[in-house]
């Protein structure tokens, strides 16, 4: 999405500009196993990038699967690359699929069967998945999910200074990390996890799989 605007930045740089460093220990009754994350909520990452680079972020949602596809199809046909939020479990190029509805990709094209996406370097960069699987991924309900969320980025009349943006992002990230709103986030969340993790051996129904999945998510 940024390259379309003439902005060339690496994944690590975008993570920093998105004020992405964080920690969360998340457990709900509806979850089979607690979730451990090493970054901020994915929604905020995109918002922070747009804020620090003086870009306009347009986010939309709809409960209609057909409308959700028609909307992004129209944008793609007009030459606009679109960001999508979805559950990566359904993406056919994932070698080890797990349910995580806070995953983001960019879609830049499609044909009668497949959608052409850009994912992280870890997941292969330029990839494809069937239109059917994409629809399932976008409409999935559950923790961290949204209603077929999609977004676009556009330039404003304000240019950005990268050095200033980096400095501000680091300050903001440090401030948020040192002042978590609840005790299961940031450094307080790490402390809480250190005590809660010992209980997992007694509550997990599949210790090997649950611990392996947790480690993979952190990586």
Language model: regions and residue ranges:
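Helix-coil boundary and N-terminal low-complexity module in membrane systems
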Residues: 15-16
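Noncatalytic regulatory segments and standalone regulatory/sensor domains
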Residues: 113-219
């Amino acid at each position: 999405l940024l390259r379309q605007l003439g902005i060339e930045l690496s994944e690590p740089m975008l993570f920093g500009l998105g004020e992405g460093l964080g920690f969360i220990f998340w457990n709900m009754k509806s979850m089979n196993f607690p979730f451990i994350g090493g970054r901020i909520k994915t929604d905020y990452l995109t918002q922070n990038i747009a804020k620090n680079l003086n870009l306009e972020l347009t986010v939309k949602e709809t409960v209609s699967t057909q409308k959700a596809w028609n909307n992004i199809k129209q944008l793609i046909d007009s030459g606009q690359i679109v960001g999508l939020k979805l559950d990566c479990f359904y993406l056919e190029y994932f070698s080890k699929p797990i349910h995580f509805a806070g995953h983001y990709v960019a879609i830049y094209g499609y044909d009668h069967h497949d959608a052409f996406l850009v994912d992280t370097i870890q997941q292969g960069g330029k990839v494809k998945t069937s239109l059917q699987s994409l629809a399932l991924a976008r409409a999935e309900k559950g923790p961290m999910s949204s209603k077929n969320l999609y977004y676009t980025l556009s330039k404003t009349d304000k240019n950005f200074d990268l050095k200033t943006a980096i400095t501000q992002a680091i300050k903001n990230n440090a401030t948020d990390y040192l002042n978590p709103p609840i005790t299961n986030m940031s450094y307080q969340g790490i402390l809480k996890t250190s005590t809660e993790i010992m209980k997992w051996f007694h509550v997990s129904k599949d210790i090997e799989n649950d611990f392996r999945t947790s480690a993979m998510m952190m990586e």
